[in-house]
Amino acid sequence: MHAHLDCLSGVVLGCAKQHGVPVRIAHAHTTNQLRDFKYPIKDLYKRIIPRTATDLLACGEDAGRWMFGSAPFLVLPIAIDTEKFRFDKNMREDMRRTLGITKEELLIGHVGQFRKEKNQAFLLDVLHSLRACGTKSKLLFVGDGEKRAAVQNRAAALGLTPYVLFLGVREDVPALLHAMDVFCMPSLYEGMPLAVLEAQAAGLPCLVSNGVPKDCLQTPRARQLPLSAPPSKWAEVILAESKVLSAAPPVLQSFDICENARMLTAYYLQKDVQRRRETAHGSADRIYADV
C-alpha cells in the first residue's frame, strides 16, 4: 500500500498493518500544516507514521524531515512531462494575443489553488508596486479555490481589477506559462510545488518565497525572496529578472516523468523481492521449527 495522505497516512497504514499488508509506504508531500483547530490532531497522527509504515518516501528533503522527523526516508522527486512544457515562441505569441497582453506589458503569472497558505493576495501588492513606478504590468492567476473571491475583492479595493486576470481551472497550462514573463509563488509553505517545476521547465524566471523548499529551485533563473521583504523589493527583482534572456533551455532530468517512472518501478520491484525473500525465510524458519 502506498499512502499519499500526509498526516493521515499513519491511520490508513495502521489499518493495513492490522490486516497483514506487508509493504506499507507513507509519502510526504508538504513541509507544514495550517495551525488551525485541527492541527493538534494532525500532529498526533503524524507521529504514528514511522510506527505503522514499513517505508517512508518524500517529495523533497524538507518534506521528509517535517513529516518523519529523524526517521530515515527516501526522496522520490515529483514528476513532470518536461517535453510538454518546452518553450514555444509561437504558442507564447498566440496566447498573449488571446489574453490581450501587448508586447510592452509585463505579465506576472501564478498557478495554484486559492487557499490561505498560497498567499496570492501578496502578489496584488507586488503588482501595485510595479504599476506605481510606471511599469506596464498585469497579473495572471490560474486556478480556483475558497479564497478566490477574497483575492478578487482585494484587487478591486486596490483599483487593480483591469490589470488582474482570473482564469480559473485551465487545461492549457503549458501555453499559459509560455505567455508569462515571470512566475511567482509567495506561499507560506509548500512541499514540492508542481507549478514551480513546470514553470522552470518552460524556461521562465521564477521568484518564490522562503516557504518554498530550496530543492525546488532547479535552474539559475529560479530564486527565493523572504516574505518579510516588502512588495517593492519583489517588484524590483521581478522587473530585473524579466529583462534577462534565457541562454539555454532548462534541464530538469531528475524531475522528468519517464525517469521518475523508472525510479518508482525499480523501487516497487525491490520491495517485492524483499518481501518474497522475507516470506521464504519465514517459511523456512517454520519448517525447521517443526522438525
Regions found by a protein language model. Give the residues of each.
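Donor nucleotide-sugar binding/catalytic pocket of nucleotide-sugar-dependent glycosyltransferases
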Residues: 51-91, 224
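Short hydrophobic beta-strand element within catalytic cores of glycosyltransferases
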Residues: 196, 205-209, 214
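Short His-centered aromatic/hydrophobic patch
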Residues: 3-9, 28
